[in-house]
Amino acid sequence: MRKGELQQVDAPQVLYDRPDNLFVAGFIGSPAMNLLEGKLERDGNGLVAVAGGLRLALDRELVGARPALASFVGTPLIIGIRPESIDDAAIAGDDPRRQLRGEVLLRESLGSEVMVHLSVDARQAVTDEVRELAQDIGGEAPGSADQRAIVVGRFNARSRVQTAQTARAVVDTRSLHFFDPQTGLGIYDAEATDSKELDPS
């Protein structure tokens, strides 16, 4: 519900896996989805998500399931990464094509997992939807897009990363999300995306 209007009605798992827009994406899940300014680039036969100094090779199955992504190559979009898709590279696998580096600002050991807050070389997405969502869930409104983004990851409980260190994390690119920064809509099927752009309501 946003400003009295239903945003999406579906099973909880569908809302989590395939949110219609930025508002739903950020509302479902805790901690909230990380949202970064970015773009897509072609790399050989594949696609790479680029956000500042971060480069993440996209899983081919993901690209095949979301044909609308092809029309966004080279244009701005918003990249969504859920915290549970980010893990300690020393434990989950050190794949340089899916890696991000950042300074550890905060480490929260929760027993079954470690919540790690990383300052990364990217810009946090700042839109009206993102600001409104932060207010609704009682969080801090995002700062300037010129600031380094803070990304939250759910690390394995055995992770040894410590505050003030530079940590390497690996991203499960099979579960990335993408949004049109102009409409806030999720980028999925070509036909669905076209119809939503013509009629945002």
Q: What name fits each language-model region?
A:
Residues 3-4, 27, 49:
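Extended alpha-helical regions
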Residues 11, 23, 37-39, 101-104:
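Residues located in well-ordered beta-strands
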Residues 13-16, 25, 87, 177:
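Generic structural signal for individual residues within well-ordered alpha-helical segments
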Residues 17-43:
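C-terminal boundary and immediately downstream tail of ABC-type ATPase nucleotide-binding domains
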